[in-house]
């Protein structure tokens, strides 16, 4: 039976669960022997929607709470005895690719032709090379807008134009906050960037999301095989276009972030070297897994792996995937100012895009903490960090931050001082002896 139909043949599931109950001693049952009826009622199981019938548009039209419950139930059912096996791998010729040129123009091709297209671009790989892997189809306006903002921000970054923190029409993503005056900290930081050397580079967009036209493909995507395909292409860029691994940065969203991890491992297997950085933008849950192997993104898949989580109970996951994981408003259910789980997931892309614009690299100060409550009570520990393009490569652990519900999303002002870290330096700064915690 097609494992996807497990949700449509619930009577059979319940019957099997009942048989297992009589055929096995509970004390000897392993963790994978959990039955659906152990945590869902028969009525809930019978009301479950088949994964074949769920669309991105339906999730967008649901309330955040309803969509989260639906996704969580399907995810947990898929994990019981590995009910879903990964089976979908897009053909390389069907994966659209776009190479952005320094003048803002783009070259359209597909994954099969990526390396040849790169060879035709003058000076490709002389500077930073960013590989952006999309994770959802742009049939969603939220996905389309987020991806557009990211590409625009990279073009601005690579063209060396400084973007003011406030008061610029291009920066104002339709927010009334865009006309507010800059704070003193914003002005000081913006002034400091006037003498900064601009960054140059190449942007390649692998539009994996366009192949995930329904929830079935999304759920059944073979993360490892798809990542291996992209990893081999990156090796070709190194071998045939002289792109060294230390300048390759993969930025990937949603399920694409999990694919990026597999791509990084494949690159290392074939070259013996690691990619410089992988940035995960709201990495998703993995529904279909090989029961005999670990899959998805993890620290060690690149020299540095950082992740931004904005929809932990919806499209994303609260599972740590990087050297450093940033949780916006803590491991909360959804990003502030969003109305559905798709929009919430895309906020990670919007935040990262904002940090790319020259002058905004430190718009998202964060503090090492285990919860939002710890952050709000100034009980975080460790040094201040910045989420986004300016994240320090020596960071480790979980970081919490707050953001604005509308753009500009970054708080911009420095993070609040935390007692455990900054308090140790008060007596040195003031020249007075004070009791420390």
Swiss-Prot record:
Tissue expression: Synthesized in the fat body and ovarian follicle cells and accumulate in the oocyte.
Domain of life: Eukaryota
GO molecular function, one term: serine hydrolase activity
Record function comment: Vitellogenin is the major yolk protein of eggs where it is used as a food source during embryogenesis.
Annotated segments matching region Disordered: 161-194, 405-437
Name of protein: Vitellogenin-1
GO annotation terms (biological process): lipid catabolic process
Annotated Gene3D superfamilies: alpha/beta hydrolase
Cellular localisation: Secreted
Family label: Belongs to the AB hydrolase superfamily. Lipase family.
């Amino acid at each position: 039976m097609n494992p996807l139909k497990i949700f449509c043949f619930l009577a059979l599931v319940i019957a099997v669960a009942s048989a297992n109950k009589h055929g096995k001693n509970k004390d000897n049952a392993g963790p994978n022997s959990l039955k659906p009826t152990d945590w869902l009622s028969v009525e809930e199981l019978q009301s479950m929607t088949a994964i074949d019938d769920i669309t991105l548009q339906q999730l967008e039209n649901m309330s955040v709470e309803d969509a989260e419950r639906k996704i969580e139930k399907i995810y947990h059912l898929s994990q019981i005895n590995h009910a879903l096996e990964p089976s979908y791998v897009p053909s390389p010729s069907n994966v659209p690719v776009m190479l952005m040129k320094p003048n803002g123009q783009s070259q359209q091709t597909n994954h099969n032709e990526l390396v040849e297209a790169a060879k035709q671009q003058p000076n490709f790989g002389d500077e930073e090379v960013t590989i952006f892997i999309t994770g959802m189809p742009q049939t969603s306006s939220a996905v389309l807008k987020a991806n557009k903002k990211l590409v625009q921000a990279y073009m601005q970054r690579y063209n060396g134009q400084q973007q003011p923190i406030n008061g610029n029409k291009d920066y104002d993503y339709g927010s009334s906050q865009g006309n507010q005056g800059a704070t003193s900290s914003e002005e000081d930081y913006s002034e400091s960037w006037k003498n900064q050397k601009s960054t140059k580079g190449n942007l390649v967009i692998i539009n994996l999301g366009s192949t995930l036209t329904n929830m079935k493909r999304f759920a059944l995507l073979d993360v490892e095989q798809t990542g291996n395909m992209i990893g081999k292409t990156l090796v070709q860029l190194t071998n045939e276009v002289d792109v060294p691994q230390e300048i390759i940065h993969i930025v990937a969203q949603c399920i694409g972030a999990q694919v990026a991890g597999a791509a990084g491992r494949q690159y290392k297997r074939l070259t013996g070297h690691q990619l410089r950085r992988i940035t995960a933008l709201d990495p998703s849950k993995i529904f279909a897994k090989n029961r005999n192997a670990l899959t998805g993104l993890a620290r060690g898949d690149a020299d540095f792996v950082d992740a931004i989580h904005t929809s932990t109970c919806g499209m994303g996951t609260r599972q740590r995937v990087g050297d450093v994981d940033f949780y916006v408003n803590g491991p909360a259910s959804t990003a502030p100012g969003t109305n559905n789980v798709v929009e919430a997931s895309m906020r990670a892309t919007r935040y990262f895009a904002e940090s790319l614009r020259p002058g905004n690299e430190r718009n998202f100060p964060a503090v090492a903490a285990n919860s939002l409550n710890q952050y709000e009570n100034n009980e975080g520990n460790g040094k201040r960090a910045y989420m986004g393009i300016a994240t320090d490569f020596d960071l480790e652990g979980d970081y919490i931050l707050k953001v604005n519900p509308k753009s500009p999303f970054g708080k911009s002002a420095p993070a609040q001082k935390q007692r455990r870290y900054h308090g140790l330096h008060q007596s040195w700064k003031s020249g007075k002896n004070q009791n420390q915690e």
